[in-house]
């Protein structure tokens, strides 16, 4: 529950000022943001990010993107930030976003119901998206964790070590057991204040209560 997560976070903050230890009762099936609802965890754990994010008024605001403009009812032009790198040091470009979204769309049908992408064209930091029908809530869709960005050309298994753009990069993941992340010093938003985090997965809520 939200209460359990809040308590776990409070406990974690008291454990260490540099690396937090968090207890949670739920976990993803993998760290591959394209699978199921796993992107919600990679987003919450600071591994992946989206082009837009909701502000306190639930209005979409630019994040990895600088702007998103509707040219006509079926065409959107997205201009990306020029200072974002993946955890392997590669620059995030329109081509890398295009490749990531193509992969996610092939794996997860829910992605296609968010943005209804028909085709995309990448040019430097500009991505032009043509949709199969008008999508008035297109920018809201860009806030959904499933539309987060990873470097699909990166080495390694994205289900264990996805290469995202967030303040933290994946170190290890054991399903239903434990996850660990460490800070990405070159994060575009500034070096993270924490060195990392350990997320212990405790399926038994009674055990979680005792741990608190």
Language-model regions: role of each:
Residues 1-20, 59, 103-106:
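Short, low-complexity disordered leader/linker segments with a strong preference
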Residues 69, 110-152:
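Surface-exposed binding/hinge segments that line
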Residues 23-71, 102, 163-164:
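N-terminal lobe/hinge region of extracytoplasmic solute-binding protein
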Residues 89-91, 206-212:
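Short helices/loops that flank or line small-molecule/ion binding pockets
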Residues 66-107, 128:
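Aromatic- and charge-enriched surface segment that lines or borders ligand/interaction sites
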Residues 16, 72, 121-123, 175:
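Residue-level recognition of beta-strand termini and adjacent short loop/turns
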Residues 59, 142-192, 196, 206-207:
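Gly/Pro-rich hinge or "lid" segments in bacterial periplasmic/extracellular proteins
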Residues 16-29, 75-79, 97-100, 127-129, ...:
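Short, well-ordered beta-strand elements
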